[in-house]
Amino acid sequence: MLFSLKISFLMMGLSGLTAQIVLLRELLVSFLGNELTLGIILANWLILVAIGSYLIGPSVERVERKLEVFVLLQLVFSVALPLSIFLCRTFKNILLLTPGEALGFAPIWVSSFLILLPVTLPYGALFTYGCKLYSQYSREEASSVGKVYLFETIGAIIGGLLLTFLLIQHLHSFEIALVISLAMGWVSLILVWPALNQRGSGPASRSLIPSFKSALWILSGLLCLIFAYSLLSQTSTLIHHFSLQTQWRNLNVIHNENSAYGNITVTKRGEQFTFYNDGVPSLTAPVPDIAFVENFVHFPMLFHEKPESLLILSGGAGGMIHEILKYPIKRVDYVELDPLLLKLVQKFPTPLTQSELSDKRVNIHYMDGRLYTQKTQDRFDILWIGLPAPQTLQTNRLFSLEFFFMAKRIMNPHGLLVLSLPGSLTYISPELRDLNGCILDTLKRVFASVRIIPGDVNLYLASSSEFLEKIPSDEIVTRFKERNIQTNLLTENYLKYRLQERWLQWYWKSMERRKSHINSDFLPLGVYFNLSYWNALFSPYLTGIFKGFEGLQLTLFLVIIILITVLLAILFIKMPRHSRHAVTYSIFTTGLTGMIFTLAIIFTFQTFYGYLYHQIGLLVAIFMAGIAFGSYLIIHPLNRMKEHSILYLKIEIGIILFAILLPFFFLIPSPHLENKTVFFVLYAGFLVTAFLSGMFTGLQFPLAVKIYLKQPSEKWKLGQTAGLIYGADLFGGFFGGLFGGVLFLPLLGLKKTCFMMAMIKISSGLLFLLFMRSKRT
């Protein structure tokens, strides 16, 4: 039975990590790819697991048939996982939302909470029941918690590696879920079988009453048959297509595929194709958005005296290139953020896209746009950023201060950088003002001249030459007549109307702000302001909260940390018996800092490389490997160790040093990513930092349980202690995910956030010192 339990714990970790990543990927598509929502999703995952651990887990001390409940929880998890994936794709229909519609903060939090609930509640209880069962069969107490933690973590590592390098490459989400569910059902059969055949008075025979153990075994076998049939009969594929069609209501989905950069869906209505990238429309053909395309292309072309060499970063196919080729240019280099999009455009051709991509002047590059900008030695007259706004960290890579410097390097002396942002000619809301102002301030930091053409879509033209602001509107109209370009919308009168001085004066008056904001790789304010803008549209009742967050400073958080530390210190000094809660507080802060470190590593990886969608499973698996390594190091000498508290304090100091050094590890090599050696060494560095971040958690968790159980005044049992410490870790991760992704990292930036984490661990270290002192007195 002990061997079967170990297999079960491995499967528990594997299935938990796999479920988490698959659901994360599905929810990211529903939330339009915004990585800041990762923190909200992870926070909900952790709080629900903690609730399961706290509410269901403590019943382990009262329930006689522990193995029975453990197996039932596994079966509930296996059934809930495919259901949750289906809900990820269809919940917008339930809420009467349209495909591609953005959500505010509150709907994102509530919907992800409810979708994850069926999976996470049983998963949270499995750990507590697993600890008790292992101690029951192994006759061990404190070390059993660490061993279950270790087996679960090893399973999570295996799951992350399998998911990243095998499952995602060949299976869709429902197939992955059914494979996991089948494995969980198989493990349930293994656990029930010994109890089914055993007679006597051992734990196995007592744990299951005869009538129920037979029914449980039959249920496990029946579910295994259902899962296996669904996989082998292609029922899973039918469910997959049905869920996609339901997700894209009233649209004919003809293709859906995941790439390293995200999810791309192609729909068709009549002869019109629409390509969606993570739920956001990227291009339409053969009839494009004529108004946007003509404005976005022709204004920059007319502002340049003689454009010949051009670069398009995303959004070129489906109209832009067609309009550009009306001019006597020499070459157009076209790069997409996701190369799969170009391949699908060629797979589903239209006369428009075929003529664009087959022209000899068009050079297509199947690589990441930012990486191309770093590596190319060519120079360009006009560079277009064909993305609507920095709504994700992936797109923010082309709107940051660092990227603008890269773009400036490859522009000719009178070259133009062109981008667009949401605008209005009637009313600019505070959120829209902040979004536009942030990108404008960033452009001005790099370029000598920035020309704005206000409208429902604001056009920004930036150049290192001051000639741009001196070009009169009459000159633009003259060039339009001389070049004799045939357009559908643009006319001489339209050009005069758009370039009237009154629009520019109105724009500058509407954009008056007290503070300048710079959008950078490590301080992605553009993403935050874009999230705030969408939140104002879809959750306006939270607008005041978002505006309040913008004014938060590191000093305020430091004051709060000091205040909490002082209050807890007074409590522990006045009431020494409560000082044991310093251990709980410490584990809470370790969970919080661990989540912040994980988000920092994930966000920075996305900023540098752009393909987090594919690699997130690997990064989380390496984090879990660190936990496993830390647990392994500490478990074996745990019972022989005498000075548990001193070692625990040393680990606290290690976390503090890690928090201080982490940002510099990323900041120092970041300007040199075009170098292949730096590129791959830094990639390995991400894996190392993820490993170290997990290792600190793995070292502390078993120690915390041991220290807590050693307290003579405590009468807590193993299951209660495991639930308490595990729950504290998860609650810390919850707060880290909730505030780290949408508050700390976007508003404070990487350096200040990591410094704040160091201060939090200094706080927990000082309180733990008080706990050590109280034990000696």
Model-derived features: positions:
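Alpha-helical transmembrane segments of multi-pass membrane proteins
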Residues: M1-E469, S473-T777
